[in-house]
Amino acid sequence: MAYSKLRRNTSQRKSLLRSLVSDLIIKEKIITTESKAKELQKKVEKVITLAKKKSLHHRRQVFKKLFDENINKEQTVTQKLFTTTAEKYMKRNGGYTRIIKTVPRRGDAAPMAIITFV
């Protein structure tokens, strides 16, 4: 399967994508570069598909793919994913996110995009 290296070594790329997946689940909308948004979309689609299955095995698989940080005092990222986000897309078979291209970033003219849940 082809993927973008994002000009980082393996550990940095995995950490970046885990962080972006967690942030997208928390905030439900992220502004980032186009290439990061495309890679993030692949990861988020897989994580939500795993979360919809709701077994212990799939929960452990999800823990590997994101940082489980606290959103507030009552809820963590995985709790929000398994309760709110997975329930929202239970009848949908993929296509949980959308990428909207925006104006290039000022300074280096990098192509920017907004990634959000549908």
Curated annotation (Swiss-Prot):
The keyword Hydrolase does not apply. It holds the Pfam family Ribosomal_L17. GO terms for biological process: translation. GO terms for cellular component: cytosolic large ribosomal subunit. The keyword Amino-acid biosynthesis does not apply. Keywords: Ribonucleoprotein, Ribosomal protein. One of its GO terms (molecular function) is structural constituent of ribosome. Part of the 50S ribosomal subunit. Contacts protein L32. Belongs to the bacterial ribosomal protein bL17 family. This is Large ribosomal subunit protein bL17.
